[in-house]
UniProtKB/Swiss-Prot annotation:
Organism listed in the record: Streptococcus thermophilus
Active site: 439
GO cellular component, one term: cytosol
Pfam families in the cross-refs: Pyr_redox_2, Pyr_redox_dim
Cofactor: FAD
Gene, per the UniProt record: gor
Compartments, record wording: Cytoplasm
Keyword Secreted: no
UniProt-annotated binding residues for FAD: 14-15, 34, 41-42, 50, 115, 303, 311, 439
Name of this protein: Glutathione reductase
Key words of the record: Cytoplasm, Disulfide bond, FAD, Flavoprotein, NADP, Oxidoreductase, Redox-active center
Length: 450
């Protein structure tokens, strides 16, 4: 017997949860399938535990670098990593509980088993068949290992969250968000951490002026940055340490190797070939601006599509899809332009819109004007452990519409959200100039640049 629903959601990550709940709120009969822990990458091995670890690193930096400058004579007797890990997991467990309460409140049925397509509108789960006119694929992605000898001796970001102690010596290989964040956390928690990137700087999609500040801060406080370094081999030694070789003839021996060299979409293992759904050249599921795949009635969003691998993007896309399918908002869709983002580096980076380089490439240098301010945040200014903060506005045309806003420094991670609203609304430099600053704050620099 086939069980009938209005909406089947395959994947219990951020996008799937958001879409399932919104559809049920509009009266749809919804069932969600997830073979792992509810919450997906973000809650279990991504944003949430990463941010907890970043906060732990912030506490360490405060104690080691700034407490003395504020007059506190601090003696650190011990750092118990097990306590941090246990409290982190307890926090995640509470989030799991909130998801379950939300499902119950909205009437979302769920089965914590893997689903598998048997045809474009039917899935099999634990021997039962389920069908619906609308099926969402929100299966997320997974971290990759490089194809080099010995790569299996390293771990990925998933394995980072399984560590039971801070490694004495760590190599992090990669140049994106995950690599920079993990390396920064381990460095702050006391590991001798080395970050290896293949090209001339990490976070190459971010504004160069901002990343230059990050690179300078790494040179002062760590992690040790190695550029133009592409790993070629990993050897496991008799004492379980790892020796990594690079194409620039550099070698390093560490206790822990973390790969952060990219992610791939989860498109196998659930019968996708039975549907006829098309994949992109990169192996992601193709979906259009309305999250439609190539097969009517099947939709895809989040990391499995490779559009923007950010949790709030998946959440918003999922809700908009359900508004369109179950609340008669036929034009509802996510605007993927001007999405703000933050890197929880040390110090944090925030950005929305075009970098200076991309703005010039798109509109021509003659149409772009850039404003920039650099200063020492007050929190770090009392003693010798000063951090630089840089903020930047990229404007277009005579009316100086702000098409890019970028910052690095203490507190930037909490500043960027409010400014992103202004950018989405089309704010100009004059709008910022006409805004009275809040003093003394770091964010006032964005509205006082000349």
């Amino acid at each position: 017997m086939v069980k009938e629903y209005d909406y089947i959601v395959i994947g219990g990550g951020s996008g799937g949860i958001a879409s399932a709940n919104r559809a049920a709120m509009h009266g749809a009969k919804v069932i969600l399938f997830e073979g792992k822990e509810v919450g997906g990458t973000c809650v279990n091995v991504g944003c949430v535990p990463k941010k907890v670890m970043w906060y732990g690193a912030q506490v360490a930096e405060t104690l080691h670098r700034y407490a003395g400058e504020y007059g506190f004579d601090v003696t650190i007797n011990n750092f118990d990593f097990a306590t941090l890990k246990a409290n982190r997991q307890a926090y995640i467990d509470r989030i799991h509980g909130s998801f379950e309460r939300g499902f119950d409140s909205n009437g979302v049925e769920r089965v914590y088993e893997y689903a598998r397509f048997v045809d474009p509108h039917t899935v099999e789960v634990a021997g039962e068949l389920y069908t619906a006119p609308h099926i969402l694929i929100a299966t997320g992605g997974h971290p990759l290992y490089p194809n080099i000898p010995g790569s299996e001796y390293g771990i990925t970001s998933d394995g980072f969250f399984e560590l039971d102690e801070v490694p004495k010596r760590t190599a992090v290989i990669g140049a994106g968000y995950i690599a920079v964040e993990v390396a920064g956390v381990l460095n702050a928690l006391g590991s001798d951490t080395h970050l290896f990137v293949r090209k001339d700087r990490p976070l190459r999609t971010f504004d160069k002026d901002i990343i230059d500040v990050l690179v300078d801060e790494m040179a002062k406080s760590g992690p040790t940055l190695h550029m133009h370094a592409n790993a070629t081999e990993v050897v496991k030694n008799a004492d379980d340490s790892l020796t990594i070789s690079f194409d620039n003839e550099e070698t390093i021996t560490v206790d822990c190797l973390i790969w952060a060299v990219g992610r791939a979409a989860n498109t196998s293992g659930f019968g996708l070939e039975k549907t006829g759904v098309e994949l992109t050249e990169r192996g992601n599921i193709y979906s259009d601006e309305f999250e439609n795949t190539s097969v009517p009635g099947i939709y895809a969003l989040g990391d499995v599509t490779g559009k923007l691998d950010l949790t709030p993007v998946a959440v918003k896309a999922g809700r908009q899809l359900s508004e369109r399918l179950f609340n008669n908002k036929v034009d509802a869709k996510l605007d993927y332009t001007d999405v703000a983002t933050v890197v929880f580096s040390h110090p944090a980076i925030g950005a929305i819109g075009l970098t200076e380089e991309k703005a010039i490439a798109k509109y021509g240098a003659e149409n772009i004007k850039v404003y920039k301010s650099s200063f020492t945040p007050m929190y770090t200014a009392l003693g010798d452990n000063r951090q630089l903060s840089t903020m930047k506005l990229v404007t277009l045309g005579e009316d100086e519409k702000i098409i890019g806003l970028h910052g690095i420094g203490y507190g930037v991670d909490e500043m960027i959200q409010g400014f992103s609203v202004a950018i989405k609304m089309g704010a100009t430099k004059a709008d910022f100039d006409n805004t009275v600053a809040i003093h003394p704050t770091g964010s006032e620099e964005f509205v006082t640049m000349r």
